[in-house]
């Protein structure tokens, strides 16, 4: 429906059909209830003595003329069964009552004492204001949320209808998910006691004797939280309230008790009765285990270290005695006895055969302190004893090189041994180098290959070859070639071939490079092999 704004003019929809139907229903209900009820309610609303709030509003109006106009307007509206106006479309008493209440609420709209009609002109109080637009008036009735004034009391049914309309206009809450409306079939399956028992079992798993280690992040987080709460309490921002903390139940752990009796070396579980009344042990040959082997090796190493310490004490006495005396061989008989005793301790150590003696000597050289002992002892030894140690080191050079990978301490022996090399004969030299050229059984690699990859090994080998070339050149001018010369030639050719076959990067850099080494190879090998040897030796010497 549309409301009219003067002749031939229309405005927007006044109200929806639901609102008009509600108004008509309300009018019929009010006519059936009787006029007496309405008059009593109207008198109560207009009686200033019964309503103290009405007096306050009348006092707020202030002007007697305005106050009289308000009273006249209310009485006219309540006494007339219906008001007919060009813009009202025959609205009922209750509808006009509600309309007047709405206009009373709207502060921007000026107060109208009477509704305009064609016969009676509109009366204005105060300054003349432009008449409101009926379109705005109609839209306000439907869109503006109603606020009820204390000057008017709505009928209970009318109030209920308005409340229903308000609820229908408010947006409905989002629909719940269909599965949330269904009852949980697994609810209340456990009693409170059973739940507490399950929680206790779960909390027991959180127990720890070392919380800082087992639950570090939770402990750090809770300490920071407690510090923050303490700071807030000091600043007065927070009341002292005990915060929640994870408390695990304390359950004392039973001491570990092992009822099974274990006997070392027994097979399987031993019965308790056997412990109290043991049977005769089975005669069996004991077999060493890996742990026993480790213990034996450890004890043997301790014995070697003890040997070295004892020999070092003897060596310190010798060095202290020769400090202010002339060097050997000008020493007394007592000093010679001390050196001889130390040499025998180093060489034999009460071994019955040569293999055991050599093994004891190698054990001393396998320790860094043992290498230092031999290096400091060599200058005090006689010539024959020093040569004996030199030949032993040369014969077992591959083994010593492998054991020196971690320490790299064999270099301290090169200078003392270099002085001993000059005392070697050609026959002794061939005996020392023979162990480097023999091919071990079950191996395709000669020991000299390992020696060439170590700095001390290749330096000692070059020094021995240089001294052998000097000896051969001296003997060749005096005597005819013999078996030692032939063996020496074969030895040089074999070593030269091994050097030529080895990659240049694998060849170690020597501590000293003899000047007569390349002429030595030129005398015994062909020119092509000499060129290969020269290239490798120069590369190794440069880098």
From Swiss-Prot:
GO MF terms, alphabetically ordered: RNA binding
Any single GO BP term: negative regulation of translation
Region ranges (Disordered): 24-60, 159-186
Statement: the UniProt record of this protein carries the keyword RNA-binding: yes
Consequence when changing residue 280 to Q: In OZEMA4; uncertain significance
UniProt-listed InterPro entries: Pat1-like (IPR039900), PAT1_dom (IPR019167)
Record's subcellular location: Cytoplasm; Nucleus
Feature: compositional bias, Low complexity: 161-170
Biased composition regions of type Acidic residues, renumbered to the chain: 28-60
Tissue: Highly expressed in oocytes.
Annotated keywords: Cytoplasm, Disease variant, Nucleus, RNA-binding
Primary subcellular site in the record, as a coarse category: cytoplasm
Cysteines engaged in disulfide bonds, as pairs: none
Annotated function: RNA-binding protein that acts as a translational repressor.
Protein name (Swiss-Prot/TrEMBL): Protein PAT1 homolog 2
């Amino acid at each position: 429906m549309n409301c009219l704004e003067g002749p031939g003019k229309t405005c927007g929809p006044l109200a929806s059909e639901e609102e008009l139907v509600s108004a008509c229903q309300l009018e019929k209900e009010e006519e059936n209830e009787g006029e007496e009820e309405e008059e009593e309610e109207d008198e109560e609303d207009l009686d200033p003595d019964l309503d103290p709030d009405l007096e306050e509003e009348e006092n707020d109006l202030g002007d007697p003329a305005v106050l009289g106009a308000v009273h006249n307007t209310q009485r006219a509206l309540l006494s007339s069964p219906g008001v007919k106006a060009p813009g009202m479309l025959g609205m009922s008493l209750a509808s006009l009552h509600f309309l007047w209440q709405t206009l009373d609420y709207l502060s921007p709209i000026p107060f109208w004492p009477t509704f305009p009609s064609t016969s009676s002109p509109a009366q204005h109080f105060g300054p003349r204001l432009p008449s409101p637009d009926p379109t705005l008036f109609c839209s306000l009735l439907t869109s503006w949320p109603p606020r009820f004034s204390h000057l008017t009391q709505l009928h209970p049914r009318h109030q209920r209808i308005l409340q229903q309309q308000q609820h229908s206009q408010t947006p409905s809450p989002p629909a719940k998910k269909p599965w949330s409306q269904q009852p949980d079939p697994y609810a209340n399956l456990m009693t409170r006691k059973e739940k507490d028992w399950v929680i206790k079992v779960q909390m027991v798993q959180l127990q720890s004797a070392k919380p800082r280690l087992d639950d570090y992040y939770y402990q750090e987080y809770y300490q920071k939280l407690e510090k923050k709460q303490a700071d807030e309490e000091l600043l007065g921002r927070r009341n002292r309230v005990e915060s929640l903390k994870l408390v695990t139940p304390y359950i004392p752990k039973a001491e570990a008790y092992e009822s099974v009796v274990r006997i070392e070396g027994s097979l399987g579980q031993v019965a308790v009765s056997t412990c109290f009344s043991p049977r005769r042990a089975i005669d069996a040959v004991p077999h060493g285990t890996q742990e026993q082997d480790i213990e034996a090796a450890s004890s043997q190493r301790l014995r070697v270290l003890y040997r070295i310490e004892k020999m070092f004490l003897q060596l310190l006495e010798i060095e202290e005695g020769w400090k202010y005396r002339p060097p050997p061989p000008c020493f007394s008989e007592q000093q010679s006895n001390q050196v001889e005793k130390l040499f025998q301790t180093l060489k034999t150590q009460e071994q019955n055969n040569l293999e055991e003696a050599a093994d004891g000597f190698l054990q001393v050289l396998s320790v860094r302190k043992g290498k230092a002992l031999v290096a400091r002892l060599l200058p005090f030894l006689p010539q024959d004893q020093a040569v004996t140690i030199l030949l032993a080191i040369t014969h077992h050079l591959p083994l010593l090189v492998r054991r020196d990978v971690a320490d790299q301490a064999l270099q301290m022996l090169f200078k003392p041994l270099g002085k001993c090399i000059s005392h070697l004969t050609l026959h002794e030299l061939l005996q020392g180098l023979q162990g480097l050229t023999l091919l071990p059984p079950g191996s395709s690699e000669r020991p000299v290959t390992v020696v060439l990859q170590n700095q001390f090994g290749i330096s000692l080998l070059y020094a021995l070859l240089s001294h052998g070339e000097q000896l051969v050149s001296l003997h060749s001018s005096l005597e005819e070639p013999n078996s030692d010369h032939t063996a020496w030639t074969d030895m040089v050719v074999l070593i030269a071939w091994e050097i030529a076959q080895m990659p240049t990067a694998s060849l170690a850099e020597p501590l000293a490079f003899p000047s007569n080494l390349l002429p030595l190879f030129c005398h015994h090998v062909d020119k092509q092999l000499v060129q290969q040897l020269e290239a490798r030796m120069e590369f190794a010497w440069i880098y």
